[in-house]
């Protein structure tokens, strides 16, 4: 916003001192620059967001700059983690192409961790993977130090991380490691602009091959994920209704189309329900009709469950993206801090063209601000 340019108070913005295991792109060239901060926000540093800018070959910078152009000026200004020179280049190149405004990097506060080499839009590799890995790690450090109260992450490319030597399935697993927890859960949430109803879908398994899903669906895992989903939904309703999707067609057809429902899911759900009578638990339901009520609730035509447990990645993401592609937010649960991200990828095919839509990033930032205060 234009009001951010009228800044009077200077604040030092430096990377945190971290153990030697913290990755660095080029420590000798880290020319950190401080940005001014509005007087009204000077005492609100712990209430602001930290935003890692994602893979520099993707659309992360574009959607962040577009989202910040619409960020309410009365909210604390987020702290960005990335490369200033690269961000300024993106702004210069994208501004004439973009149909919507972009925030001027000159008015934004940023921890500057420079890129060691030029990155071309759409061409991810070891250099871009090393950068996005470092930026994420530094953004987490800012949250853990209390300088920010929530983390928003722009998309990264897993193959770029792997090329840089960072063998993680995704950002969620890296966040769990940095936080010192065994795992974090992926929840996708969106609020219908038509009805106000909130879609909440949690994944029982995440980035694993489909062939590995049945073996991963232990009773303990399913019950653990239900605990996480119920706890989140109880923020909004004390006695929530949860729905669990089946794994097989027709939810196994009483064991005729697969035994996972009979042998694992149904006993696990019954035992969990006995321990949690305050929650209405339904399932396992046939996956092809499990989210029908969600579609009606999104349109304002009916009520639906407060939360859905999907058993594998695409089972949960297909209904989420059909209903709320531009509004959905990925929220990591089970961490000691709040993390959200947009529900889309790096967008390499459209990087550098100025046409990326920022609604999901805007929703991720708004959700982080809302949930961190809940």
Model-based region annotation:
Residues 3-12, 17, 22-24, 29-34:
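Low-acidity, Ser/Thr- and Arg-rich intrinsically disordered low-complexity segments
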């Amino acid at each position: 916003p234009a009001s951010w340019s009228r800044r009077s108070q200077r604040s030092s913005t430096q990377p945190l001192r971290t153990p030697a295991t913290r990755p660095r792109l080029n420590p000798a060239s880290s020319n950190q620059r401080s940005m001014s901060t509005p007087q009204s926000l000077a005492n609100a540093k712990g209430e602001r967001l930290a935003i890692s800018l994602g893979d520099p070959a993707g659309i992360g910078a574009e959607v962040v700059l577009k989202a910040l152009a619409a960020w309410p000026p009365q909210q604390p200004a987020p702290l960005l983690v990335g490369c200033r020179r690269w961000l300024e280049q993106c702004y210069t190149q994208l501004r004439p192409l973009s149909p919507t405004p972009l925030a001027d990097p000159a008015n934004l506060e940023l921890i500057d961790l420079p890129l060691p080499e030029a990155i071309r839009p759409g061409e991810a590799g070891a250099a871009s993977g090393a950068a996005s890995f470092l930026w994420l790690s530094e953004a987490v450090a800012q949250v853990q130090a209390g300088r920010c109260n929530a983390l928003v992450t722009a998309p990264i490319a897993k193959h770029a991380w792997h090329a840089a030597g960072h063998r993680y399935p995704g950002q969620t697993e890296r966040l769990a490691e940095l936080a010192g927890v065994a795992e974090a859960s992926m929840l996708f949430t969106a609020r219908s602009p038509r009805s106000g109803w909130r879609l909440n879908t949690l994944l029982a398994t995440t980035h694993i091959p489909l062939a590995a899903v049945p073996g991963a669906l232990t009773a303990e895992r399913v019950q653990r994920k239900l605990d996480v989903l119920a706890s989140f939904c109880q923020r909004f309703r004390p006695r929530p209704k949860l729905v669990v999707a089946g794994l097989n067609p027709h939810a196994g057809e009483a064991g005729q189309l697969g035994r996972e429902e009979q042998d694992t899911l149904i006993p696990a759900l019954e035992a969990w329900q006995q321990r949690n009578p305050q929650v209405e638990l339904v399932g396992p339901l046939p996956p092809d009709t499990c989210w029908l009520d969600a579609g009606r609730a999104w349109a304002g035509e009916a009520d639906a469950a407060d939360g859905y447990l999907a058993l594998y990645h695409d089972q949960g993401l297909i209904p989420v993206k059909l209903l709320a592609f531009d509004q959905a937010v990925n929220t990591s649960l089970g961490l000691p801090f709040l993390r959200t991200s947009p529900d889309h990828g790096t967008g390499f095919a459209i990087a550098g063209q100025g046409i990326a839509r920022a609604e999901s990033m805007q929703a991720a930032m708004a959700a982080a601000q809302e949930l961190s205060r809940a």
